[in-house]
Amino acid sequence: MSPRWAKRIGALALFALMGAAQAVDTGVKCPNGQPADGVLHVGSERHCLVMRLIEPAQAQTQVLAVFMHGDNSGRSELRTDRGNAFTLADKLRVSTVALLRPGYQSELGRSDGYNLGRDDDYTAGNVEVVATALAQLRQLHPGKKLLLVGHSGGAAMTGLVAARFPQSADAYLLAACPCDVPPWREWRQSSAGRGGFWPNSLSPLAEAPKVPVSTRIALIVGSQDDNTLPRFSEAYVARL
């Protein structure tokens, strides 16, 4: 690991050592009339995302973690008793938002945005929807550092937010990112018969030059990951 990446990962850890802040209600209403209160919905009058705020006991940080799930998931990530968002909140002891990505459906409702069968949805429009939601979360949690964490497809979206709306978060963590979308789709076709070109999706690798050099961003991927191969993350890091 290069010193640059070690420094960035260290910055993520430092965020977890700060104290907590209070949320503020902005009174924004979602398109469905529900309040964008930072508890079950967040966004703007144009589009809102469904969310679940997980508050671990004795959370003593000034960090708000936001977790974006991968493709073909989302439902389990809105639970308060298990799932990746719950684990993140529990391990870091920080308030954590489980964010339902644009177009996804859950028991709490459907997030606004485009979703074609939970495929080919890393679109410019969806990236903007996420950035709008993050901007409102900042308003609802003044004084907190915002850590955006994405897994798999959520990691791809996280990388795209970092490129197109870099002020959306104070730090970014991409886990198992399919960061080079066209080769990843080819790989999924050959390895699992689940490929097909995604004409509507942006590729984080292509957008990487837009990420400001000062951005705190880190990637993690398992050496045995047979879906989002390590080389897709490595290629992205090399482009930053």
Q: What residues fall within each predicted segment?
A:
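Bacterial N-terminal signal peptides that target proteins for export
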Residues: 2-10
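Short, surface-exposed "cap/lid" segments of acyl-processing enzymes
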Residues: 48, 55-94, 98
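Cap/lid segment of the alpha/beta-hydrolase catalytic domain
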Residues: 100-124
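Alpha/beta-hydrolase active-site loop
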Residues: 116-140
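The feature captures the conserved acid-bearing segment of alpha/beta-hydrolase catalytic domains
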Residues: 181-240
